[in-house]
């Protein structure tokens, strides 16, 4: 499944088409005669955008930021020593604030006798990793800080205190109940802040330099069923940005590299609707923008999978299977392709079967059968700046190398009908497209994973498991 989705992402860049594949059915295309006049303009825009992206995409700082994020993932999220260091602090906070539950309250109705509140805006400690990595020294601080050991490229050695994460929590707070273990009578109420800002600094000669910064905001719309936030019943939206800024380096002739990823993620479990938007910017210029809005049918879909699943693509597949999807991709704020899928589950199944058949050297008739079915459930079109026309698209079976493929094709309302992108683009443009896929696909996927892991760290350094463990230990003392 993951390979199929990665192929789809690759196809997106090659044809400037869509998040999945670029295709439409013939019904309702109705291309106008004016479209033919725009054929050269669309081809010109496509070639120019592919060339510009291929020559200017620079993921150096993203890749470095992703590596630093992986260090924190290993050192913190998967480190039992961090568990040992943070749980006593939870226990202390819980013990300090235990109060009796008021009669007639929601907590009383749930069977709790006592409760304690932990305010994340005031949970500020500095965790400094010991030199041998055996644990953490803990002290109070103005913000939540982590100082860890890591690899110093200057000395090419593992060193103490070469990375520092600073987390600031502020804004409004939402009440959330920690997961309950068994029939405990002590409730732990977490006050989750609406605003988070963070930075990751790396040691350079003489001082710490911020190489990775970001911020995000939680927007929660309570369903009214409870005063406590529940992502399975309440609408939640997360917006933010992560960015890195590497100055020009004389050695190696590295140019200045400022990159940013703007993201927006929302889910409404009542309306069964979800949306995602990612904008990749380089040196203050928007390069690639991905947007998707899904209507899903799974009533029990858990949006928390976004920050716990191994792959963001797996989450998207789980979300839209059996539902519908509206999506778009924009290159250089110029060339935009939009698509509509009325049955995502069927589309994914057909893509999987077609890919398997193609790898087994299926004949033209076999691939044509899949092409026809895909065109019945997926529609797409393309537009670009300065041209007041939308060009309809669909899949067309074409031979590519030794295999038959379902290729995106465009209709410019002339005698040629639908023409596949391999016929429209010159050899150089196709080469640029392959360069983009080769350079961009993996770093972009890594950047999205970094967003997910940062949300996981920021929102769950007080994970349900840790709070539950602290709650159980505190209650038994």
Language-model regions: role of each:
Residues 1-9:
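Bacterial N-terminal signal peptides that target proteins for export
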Residues 24-162, 427-477:
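Acidic/polar, low-complexity intrinsically disordered N-terminal segments immediately downstream
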Residues 204-377:
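Acidic, serine/threonine- and glycine-rich low-complexity intrinsically disordered segments
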Residues 135, 158-160, 286, 347, ...:
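Short, solvent-exposed loop/turn motifs
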Residues 9-17:
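Hydrophobic alpha-helical targeting segments used for export or membrane insertion
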Residues 99-281:
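Long, acidic/polar, low-complexity amphipathic helices and coiled-coil-like
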Residues 18-22:
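C-terminal motif of bacterial Sec signal peptides marking the signal peptidase cleavage site
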Residues 39-43, 353-477:
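Extended terminal
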């Amino acid at each position: 499944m993951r390979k199929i989705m990665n192929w789809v992402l690759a196809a997106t860049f090659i044809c400037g088409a869509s998040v999945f594949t670029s295709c439409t059915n013939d019904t309702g295309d109705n291309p106008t005669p004016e479209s033919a006049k725009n054929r050269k303009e669309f081809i010109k825009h496509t070639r120019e955008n592919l060339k510009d992206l291929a020559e200017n995409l620079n993921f150096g700082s993203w890749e470095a930021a992703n590596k630093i994020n992986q260090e924190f993932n290993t050192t913190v999220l998967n480190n039992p020593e961090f568990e040992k260091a943070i749980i006593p602090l939870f226990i202390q906070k819980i013990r300090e604030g235990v109060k009796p539950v008021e009669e007639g309250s929601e907590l009383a109705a749930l069977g709790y006798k006592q409760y304690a509140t932990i305010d994340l805006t005031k949970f500020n400690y500095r965790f400094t990793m010991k030199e041998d990595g055996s644990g953490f020294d803990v002290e109070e601080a103005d913000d939540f800080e982590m100082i860890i050991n890591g690899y110093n490229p200057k000395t090419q050695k593992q060193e103490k205190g070469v990375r520092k994460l600073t987390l600031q929590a502020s804004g409004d707070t939402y009440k959330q109940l920690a997961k309950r273990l068994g029939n405990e009578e002590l409730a732990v109420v977490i006050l989750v802040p609406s605003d988070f800002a963070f930075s990751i600094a790396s040691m350079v000669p003489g001082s710490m330099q911020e190489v990775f910064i970001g911020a995000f905001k939680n927007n929660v719309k309570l369903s009214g069923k409870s005063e406590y936030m529940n992502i399975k019943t309440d609408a939640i939206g997360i917006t933010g940005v992560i960015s890195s800024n590497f100055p020009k380096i004389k050695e190696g002739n590295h140019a200045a590299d400022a990159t940013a990823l703007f993201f927006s993620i929302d889910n409404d479990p009542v309306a069964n609707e979800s949306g995602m938007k990612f904008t990749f910017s380089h040196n203050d210029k928007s390069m690639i923008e991905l947007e998707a809005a899904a209507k899903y049918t799974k009533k029990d879909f858990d949006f928390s999978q976004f920050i716990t699943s191994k792959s963001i693509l797996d989450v998207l597949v789980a979300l839209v299977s059996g539902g519908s999807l509206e999506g778009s991709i924009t290159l250089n704020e110029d060339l935009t392709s939009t698509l509509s899928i009325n049955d995502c589950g069927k589309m994914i199944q057909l893509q999987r079967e077609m890919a398997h058949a193609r790898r087994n050297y299926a004949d033209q008739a076999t691939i044509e059968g899949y092409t026809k079915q895909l065109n019945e459930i997926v529609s797409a079109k393309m537009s670009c700046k300065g041209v007041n026309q939308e060009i309809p698209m669909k899949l067309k079976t074409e031979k590519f190398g030794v295999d038959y493929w379902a290729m995106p094709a465009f209709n410019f309302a002339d005698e040629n009908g639908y023409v596949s992108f391999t016929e429209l683009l010159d050899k150089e443009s196709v080469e640029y497209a392959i360069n983009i896929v080769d350079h961009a696909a993996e770093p972009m996927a890594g950047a999205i994973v970094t967003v997910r892991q940062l949300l996981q760290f920021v929102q769950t350094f007080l994970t349900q498991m840790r709070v539950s463990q602290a709650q159980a230990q505190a209650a038994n003392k």
